[in-house]
Amino acid sequence: MVEKQFNIDLELNDTGHIDPFLQDEDKLKLEELIPRILFERKSFLNVTEDSLRKEIDNSLKISEEDALDTEESREDTVEADQQEVFNKHKFELSKNINNALNETQLSLDFVSLLISSVKPSLAKSTISPHLSKFVKPTSLNSDRLGQDSNDNQESKATDSFGQGWKLESLGKITDLFREASTNLNDQVIKERRYWNMINLVLANDEVLFRMRDPQNNARAIGVKYGYGDSGSNFHDQGLALLRKDNQTGEISFHPISSINNAKIVEKVSRFIRVKILSQIDGDYMLTGQSIFNFDFEKSKQSIINDIEKARFFLFEEDLFHQLIREAKLLVNYNVSIISNKIIIEINNIIIEIESIVYDELNEEELENYYQNVNEYSTLHNKKCQLILNYLKLMLCCYYKYNLKLKQKVPTALTKWKQSNSHPLILRPLVGNMRHELNLLNMKSVLDRLMHAHESELSYSKLDVEKFINLATRSKKQNPFQKSIEKPISKFHLVLCNKTSNMLDVNIQLTTNESFVNLIINMTIIRFETEDDFKNNVNGINVLQLGFSDFNEIEECLDWSIQNFV
């Protein structure tokens, strides 16, 4: 047992209150305090400083010991209280565990005794030894109670509810199957329509390829409607996406920029129109114009018409692009480029080749209704249409030329030709027209000289042979030979003076590869007699010169004739 110390406050009475009759020494007066001190100390004769110091130290030690004793007693009291609480809780826990074990054992024994009549072996393994000793294993049994009529009604209602739920589920499943069948049938119809349209495009001899739809990256089929496989090197390859409509299964035509970086592009359809303006009464008036003539409704299928329409306008765009390339080389020969128009000026005639935006709603523009103003406005319509057809044919020839270069064995020469070749489309047209004009000018020069020296000559004869380079060809010549070879024409002038001397003048008009430059080669041979001229013997070569201007050759020929006569 821990020893407990009890301290009694002397100032407290038996009820725990301070006694009012006890005097507080701190509040006593001096005359009351001195007698009490004398009574306690009795005598001050033997009081010294050391004795007082010892007394004070002893009093301090006593107070410290009292404080320590008080703290120890408090700690012991707290520990005793905690131990008591722990023991109490431990006892309650043990009691609860025992109660739980007893109740569990009783429940187990009850269940074991209940099933002992059905499963004896299982009951023996689980029943407690005490119960098996005092109670017979099969003494406890159970019976099933009979059901009331309400239970039968409830079971019937339950069966009815079950059948209703089954019927409802069956109806929902039937609707789902019917909806799935309808959707599947619609999908089959859409797929059949889609592949039928793809087959129509393929049957139209179109080239198809696989690609991704740039809108949703889904698999799709594209079509090549351009002329890349025919020899075209135009930057627009003519590619389009055949996009499927998920609602109907039909396909629609959408041009794209390229295969690798496919983007849907909105193209502006343009076509080429040729106009001729002639000088009438000092003013240039429209005397001819080509007609836009293309049937976009040849097929019953809109997708085929869209492809043909895109192919037509792509060809027109490529043609005008090649014409612009050539026109830049002919700027010094009265050929100018203004916006989307090429202007050619030749001998009081202006030929305009213009790229016009196609507007299917503007029928007056397409059919030239406004052109029939006077008798001259349609004078050269056929000529304009022939010029346009010629330009298109020459572009096809250029395609064929490029295709042959691609089929040849790749060498440095063929690669150079592929990258540096320019089409012969506009230059042959302008060159041959200028050549015809040069022939007229040359003939007028010779006629003027013959007329000027007519009195001094006894005989003169002029023969003109046009395009002698084509005349030497066989009958199976290339119909485009005139457009791919530079023109060569010949003037043969024979003069005879009063003394029967003969002067044979041969003039050849040609050009270079540009088809527009003027090259004149003149050869003059003098014969003493007419027989020498006929036999082509004893001829004296007087002149053999080349010219590029009619004034120069006129002066030179005039001087030669004056010396001859």
From Swiss-Prot:
Domain of life of the native organism: Eukaryota
Location of the protein in the cell: Nucleus
Residue stretches of biased makeup (Polar residues): 138-152
InterPro entries assigned to the protein according to its UniProt record, in alphabetical order: Mediator_Med17
Any single Gene Ontology cellular-component annotation: core mediator complex
BP terms from Gene Ontology: regulation of transcription by RNA polymerase II
Sample GO molecular function, one term: transcription coregulator activity
Short name of any one Pfam family annotated for the protein: Med17
Gene3D superfamilies for the chain: 6.10.250.2620
Alphabetical UniProt keywords: Activator, Nucleus, Transcription, Transcription regulation
Region feature Disordered, mapped onto this chain: 138-160
Function: Component of the Mediator complex, a coactivator involved in the regulated transcription of nearly all RNA polymerase II-dependent genes. Mediator functions as a bridge to convey information from gene-specific regulatory proteins to the basal RNA polymerase II transcription machinery. Mediator is recruited to promoters by direct interactions with regulatory proteins and serves as a scaffold for the assembly of a functional preinitiation complex with RNA polymerase II and the general transcription factors.
Family label: Belongs to the Mediator complex subunit 17 family.
Quaternary structure and interacting proteins, as annotated: Component of the Mediator complex.
Name of this protein: Mediator of RNA polymerase II transcription subunit 17
Natural source organism: Candida albicans (strain SC5314 / ATCC MYA-2876) (Yeast)
Gene behind this protein: SRB4
